[in-house]
Amino acid sequence: MSMGTFLTDKKVKIRVNGSVPGEDIDFNEGAAVTSNDSTFSGVFRWRFGEKWSVAGQYWDSSDSSFVTLTEDIGWEDYTLKAGSNIGAGVELTVARVFFGRSFHTGARHEFGLGAGLHWLEFGAFIEGEFFINDESTGFRREAVSADAPLPNIGGWYWYAFSPRWMLTTRVDWLGITVGDYSGSLWNANAAINFQAWRHVGLGLSYQYFALDVDIEKSDWNGGADLTYRGPFISLNVNW
């Protein structure tokens, strides 16, 4: 089990279509949502039987800000004008469960494949003075949200340099249409782990999560392009 801090560098673009398809809104630049964040992250793995295991992961990220627009932004059939002050925010929660089987193990290495499920909750909002056909509709807050279970396949490889040092890598992938969602998902990690004591170790890894999805729901017709990446510093406990 690992617990620690995920130092994310995030890039967020969303699209909310109106009567005609819209353009992506860059929340890092146009809405000035910060690209850097730190959040708690937890990972666990339990081996049952000689070759089977189940793993899990959880982390979330949220941020909001206020900014003066430098260009017009379109949201459904509404427009927020350049020069106006707006508030904006995004949040993402990721929970992952993965069942795997080891196919090749040795004294110093292990390789396995499996399948899992990501549960994602994503939301975004913009608030300010909205216009439609150049006429003000007044101050309002518009928000979209989506949550979905997305299945995936993946694999991992571990290599122990010595009794105390180990390299671990894993990757999950999804490219499929599921209900109202279609697109791709990548969730990858590469880590160096040091076993400082018998049951306690330290880890430094690089985490990469990317979701590019089109959404066709009654309350959100559009899409999202999300990338969260950065180091994960952890305390590892094993028994």
Positions of predicted regions on the chain:
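Residues on the lipid-exposed face of transmembrane beta-strands in outer-membrane beta-barrel proteins
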Residues: 3, 42-46, 97-101, 115-117, ...
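Repeated loop/turn-to-beta-strand initiation elements of outer-membrane beta-barrel proteins
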Residues: 51-54, 109, 163-167, 198-202
